[in-house]
Amino acid sequence: FPWMEPEGRVTILRTPAGYGLNVHLDSTEDEIGTSQHKFRIVLNGNVDKLYFIDKHKNEVYIPDNYYTYVLDGSHPHALKPGTEEKVTLCIGAPWNGELTPDYTKLLENSLYNMKVSRPESLEDSWTDPFWKK
């Protein structure tokens, strides 16, 4: 991906049918509001099982046609169990590279864009012990 500086780590995430992920952050609390981007391409499976938590602690689901997206790993999110195995190409750990002109253009010209408010407080269980200090 020529717009990535530095290059992001590429992995394949496999989520078996009937499995999900609890609400979590992919960052420390100190990183909230910084560039914690995660680039995803869903190769197979239910797309609309991914959701974010808004300021009222509601679940805000992504549309079922968002097969390619960038998400903010510092925003609380989760995955409901799906009826199909989900296979996702993931770039980022999360990727927190430079906002290059090409990457900025990619974000600004995206066909899809979701703005989800952030919860005013975080649940302790949302932060993985790995990220806790």
Regions found by a protein language model. Give the residues of each.
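Short beta-strand or tight-loop elements
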Residues: G8, L21, H37, H75
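Short, conserved beta-strand element in jelly-roll/cupin
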Residues: R14-P16, I32-K49, G92
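A short beta-strand-loop-beta hairpin characteristic of the jelly-roll/cupin
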Residues: V42-D64
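Signature of the catalytic double-stranded beta-helix
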Residues: F1-Y19, L25
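Long hydrophobic alpha-helical segments typical of transmembrane helices together
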Residues: L89, A93-K133
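A short secondary-structure junction signal
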Residues: N22-D26, L50-H56, P81, I91, ...
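Conserved metal-binding segment of the jelly-roll/cupin
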Residues: V60-P76
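A short hydrophobic beta-strand segment most commonly corresponding to one strand
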Residues: H37-L43, T68-D72, T83-P101
